A protein has these predicted regions:
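MPN/JAMM (Mov34/JAB) isopeptidase/deubiquitinase module and associated MPN-bearing subunits/adaptors
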Residues: 1-81, 85-194
Length: 194
């Protein structure tokens, strides 16, 4: 199972996790499942009415029903899953594995994305990890994003996650730094020749 995350969804996931940092965020994933059985996440919409705690989050049932009814009338948007965050608390770091309750809340034919948000200890470029996460830093935060689905026996399995934008984001950022350094060096060189 593969999950592709668009640039818009990538930023929405990170911002949702940071907005309520140290508490868990919750939201829905909109997109589609293509003929190759790949989930394409186009949008991530945060639930503003979710009941948040440091170690759990619950969606507002009435608000969820309103949103589902609304989405049912928009044929171009399909709910393909949900997302929530796991954050550190005190000296403990957030982890990316789904809890027992996370697995109970999962539904067949949908994906569940977990965003792990912790304090940044050092800067790290965005990369795919050997254990199937997308990982990197922005500002003061370190993120690990993972996706899960239920197999035919209702067991949670990790999906392969892809976000070309996130990987390219670092490449563009590094390239811009090189260009800025080159431009500054060129200016110094021109001044030395004057």
């Amino acid at each position: 199972m593969e999950v592709y995350i668009s640039a818009n969804a990538f930023w929405a996931l990170l911002i949702s996790a940071i907005e309520v940092y140290k508490k868990e965020c919750f939201g829905i994933l909109l997109g589609y499942r293509d003929s190759s059985n790949i989930f394409i996440v186009e949008h991530a919409i945060s639930y503003q009415t979710a009941y948040r705690k440091h170690t759990s989050v619950e969606k507002n049932g009435r608000a969820s029903k309103r949103i589902q009814k609304f989405l049912d009338n928009l044929p171009q948007l399909s709910m393909i899953g949900d997302f929530h965050s796991h954050t550190g608390w005190g000296d403990l770091k957030g982890v990316g594995n789904p809890s027992t309750q996370d697995i109970v809340d999962m539904t067949p034919d949908h994906i569940s994305v977990i965003i792990v948000a912790n304090d940044k200890r050092r800067t790290a470029g965005w990369q795919y990890t050997n254990d199937g996460f997308l990982s990197g830093t922005v500002d003061d935060y370190h993120f690990r994003i993972g996706a899960y689905y239920l197999d035919d026996f209702s067991r949670a399995k990790r999906a392969s996650i892809f976000c070309p934008y996130a990987i390219g984001f670092n490449a563009k950022e590094s390239q811009q730094r090189v260009l800025l350094r080159a431009a500054a060096a060129s200016q110094r060189w021109l001044k030395s020749k004057a």
